[in-house]
Amino acid sequence: MDKILKKLDYYNLWNKAYLIILSLYVLINVLDTTMFEINWPEKMGYVLYAIVGGYAIAKMICFVYLKRYRAWELIFSFIIIGTFTIPAVFTTSYSYLFGIAFLIVGAKDVDFDDILKVYMIVTAAVLICAVVASQAGLIVNLQYEDPNKGIRNSMGTIYPTDFGAHIFYLAVAWVCYRNKALTWLEIGIISAVTIVVYVISAPVTSAACTFIMLFMCIWDKLADKTGSPMIVSKAEDIVCRIGQFAVGIFAAGYLLMQHLYDPLNIYWSEFDYKISLRLYYTYQILEKYSIRLFGQDIEEKGFGRDPDMTHDYLFLDDSYMAIALKYGIVILAVVIIMFAAGQHRAYRSNRLIIVLAGIVIALHCFMEHHLIEAAYNPFMLLIFAKIGAYTYKERKHKL
């Protein structure tokens, strides 16, 4: 038995198996955000959760036997599985939390750069197919008319902001994967793509956050430059130290803002209008539901796929309030700790771009609901993954 487990470890089979499972999981989830009509086999989701769960549990047993876990990793792995399982079991709509929990735990010691690579390849391939198919008339290109933004195209996805979110997360994943090897040409290409996507779909939050991310990349390059003022690198370090807790800071900020919101106050109304009535819609949902320890089924209207849905739209767009209301305040607390721990590990590994990306993602999730969605955010897998610290030459060699 001992020899078998050590051989699995020696040949890196655990990591290879994880990347195969991850690619399948991301593929299915990204396809579900497009207009491709796929009739999955009955109980396909449960089969997928069983595969991910079986892998994660077997790996945990093996790694405990080989003493590959630190105490905090093992304890927090059980906390994630336990807390995510409760709403997955007791609410009919959230069984996918099984898959998310086991994906996070199963990423133990898998190179995070390999995770990013798999995510980018699968997501980009699906998006390219969706865009081409929508323009060729093979699937629907949903169009939404906005009085301020004109016609917004979904480009084969279920909603324009979903298309924008995919591009945003791909851009962030790319700059983190490239790390210190990111070139000015790549920054220019990402900027151009972001502008084109904005013209086509007008995803304001995703476009703004992409440019903020690129600004941070430029800042990081200047901080590394020989002869750069000490204040530039010092400021980056201070921002990264604070930024490790970005998800918690933005979550607390949104919950406080929602608590103070008054729909009859003209100043709140003007501010809420600028953020697309997110506070008002959440306020309406809070009239019917309260925040619980482990969440509840919430009836929402606004999952995309329908250009006429705006007439009775009622959706939790913000990630933090969505998690608190749907999955429970306990899950939100676990998610906040999970992201803080992952960001801290990235900071300790000198992967400052990942820490800066975490800040931008936390800001993005202030407006969008993708914080713990496998189709969008691979950074939720950071906490237990292997985070390599690469110099410029080492990164170039790896690429």
Residue ranges and their predicted role:
Residues 397-399:
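Membrane-proximal cytoplasmic C-terminal regulatory module of class A 7TM GPCRs
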Residues 268-327:
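Long extracytoplasmic/lumenal interhelical loops at the membrane interface
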